[in-house]
């Protein structure tokens, strides 16, 4: 989904991406456990809240990034993210720099806080890379929004 908008007299290209981050070794970090395991359940819920808080916080600091919809599952984060590109006429191959920067900041902030909470400094929280897919049209956007809203394993969503 691409649209051109004007901000301060310059053209911007806005592109929507579906992004998926997976936990390291597909660990179920954010899974809510059996109610009898109160301490474990609280830890998982707290880790999920860290990711939710940092997702919102990091998006505030990246002016080119807007969160459309997101879902945190036990071992992954799925999000629809719009990216405004300052130079739409510049042909750039690969992942958009502002999206990559946003993901790197999110991973670093969440990993630091999660590792402090687990008392495991330096441990891997997320897989090295992430998956992204450009949303090409309204049908694809509707399908992805439905997929996110109907996910069976949602721990927390926004």
Q: Each PLM stretch: what is its role?
A:
Residues 1-158:
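Short catalytic/metal-binding and nucleic-acid-binding patches
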